[in-house]
């Protein structure tokens, strides 16, 4: 079956039962050696043997967040989804305390609110010590009733988010649950019966009647007092639960604000970086334009100078050619009359006069 959920398993709270464990924790469990070697092919019957071998409980630990065998068996139970009767037998098992906690943890994840209170509250009377592995890999001692208290009042246990649980007094008002009875109430009644028997043996009937009446009144007062104390305790549990939930919400809200501030800061940083890049591109573009203008002006000046040099070189040649031409046609004769006659003859196409 590998890591797939049993095809016959029903959805829990509208989703695959394995999804009650967060994906990152699920992935750590799938990659763990205990899951691959010890949990492969387990059924509801063979799971009991593995549960009896547990010697501690806990979630993930160490730098790589390795899962404990307890957490692996929880995921295996979600995968195969044992029947409710088997889970109840786990909880009622007095011989193996870790089997009891395993069943209570699974019922807290998958059971209804009424079943959770009905089967887990009697475990408040189990004061046996259990070992719990902390997140740093060290062990600490706790008690079964403290683990049950954590399951009923906290939002997280063993790195798994607990489903929302209705308040007990709400279920009592709706008639789904009866007021919780303390186990100490039976001890009080036994002591009162002993006192009554001693009073009957020692005193007269008047004293017996008086003692018979007074214990009854005291018993009623004690019952009322215990009932009120239980109700106050339940309200304290609910108040602590609400305070923890509000604290978690405030923490998540602050984390959300912090993420928004980080996003705004990153966005401003990217905008400023883009502006700097645009300024750099503009400066580079201006620098190239100035360089082109300088090169163009230099080329124009160079061409102008070359043209002037050519003109300066050609003017003496033209003057020389003009002088030579004037010598040939006799227009430069020292005698003005002869020079005038030569100009006239040149215009007529005749040879010039030399003397």
Swiss-Prot record:
Recorded family membership: Belongs to the PRP38 family.
Gene: PRP38
GO cellular component: spliceosomal complex
Name this polypeptide is given: Pre-mRNA-splicing factor 38
Biological classification of the source: Eukaryota, Viridiplantae, Streptophyta, Embryophyta, Tracheophyta
Pfam families listed in its UniProt record: PRP38 (PF03371), PRP38_assoc (PF12871)
Function: Probably required for the first pre-mRNA cleavage reaction catalyzed by the spliceosome.
Annotated segments matching region Disordered: 182-355
Binding partners and assembly: Interacts with SR45A.
Keywords carried by this UniProt record: mRNA processing, mRNA splicing, Nucleus, Phosphoprotein, Spliceosome
One annotated GO biological process: RNA splicing
InterPro entries from the UniProt entry: PRP38, PRP38_C
């Amino acid at each position: 079956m590998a890591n797939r959920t049993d095809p016959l398993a029903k959805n829990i709270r509208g989703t695959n039962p394995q999804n009650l464990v967060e994906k990152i924790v699920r992935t750590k469990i799938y990659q763990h050696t205990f899951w691959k070697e010890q949990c492969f092919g387990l059924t509801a019957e063979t799971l009991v043997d593995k549960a009896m071998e547990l010697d501690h409980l806990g979630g993930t630990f160490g730098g790589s967040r390795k899962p404990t065998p307890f957490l692996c068996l929880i995921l295996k139970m979600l995968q195969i989804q044992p029947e409710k009767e088997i889970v109840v037998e786990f909880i009622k098992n007095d011989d193996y305390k870790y089997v009891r906690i395993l069943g209570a943890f699974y019922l807290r994840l998958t059971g209804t609110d009424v079943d959770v209170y009905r089967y887990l509250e009697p475990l408040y009377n189990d004061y046996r010590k259990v070992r719990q592995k902390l997140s740093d890999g060290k062990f600490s001692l706790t008690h079964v009733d403290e683990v049950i208290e954590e399951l009923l009042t906290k939002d997280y246990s063993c790195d798994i988010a607990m489903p929302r649980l209705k308040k007990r007094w709400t279920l009592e008002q709706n008639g789904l649950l009866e007021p919780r009875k303390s186990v100490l109430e039976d001890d009080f009644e036994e002591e009162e019966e002993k006192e009554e028997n001693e009073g009957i043996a020692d005193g007269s009937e008047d004293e017996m009647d008086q003692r018979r009446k007074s214990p009854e009144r005291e018993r009623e007062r004690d019952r009322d007092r215990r009932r009120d104390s239980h109700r106050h305790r339940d309200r304290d549990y609910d108040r602590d639960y609400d305070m923890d939930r509000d604290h978690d919400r405030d923490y998540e809200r602050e984390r959300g604000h912090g993420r928004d501030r980080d996003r705004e800061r990153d966005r401003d940083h990217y905008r400023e970086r883009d502006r700097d890049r645009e300024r750099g591109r503009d400066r580079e573009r201006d620098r190239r334009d100035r360089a082109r203008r300088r090169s163009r002006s230099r080329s124009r000046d160079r061409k102008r100078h070359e043209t002037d040099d050519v003109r300066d070189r050609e003017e003496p040649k033209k003057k020389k050619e003009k002088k030579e031409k004037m010598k040939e046609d006799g227009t430069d004769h020292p005698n003005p009359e002869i020079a005038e006659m030569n100009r006239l003859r040149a215009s007529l196409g005749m040879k010039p006069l030399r003397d």
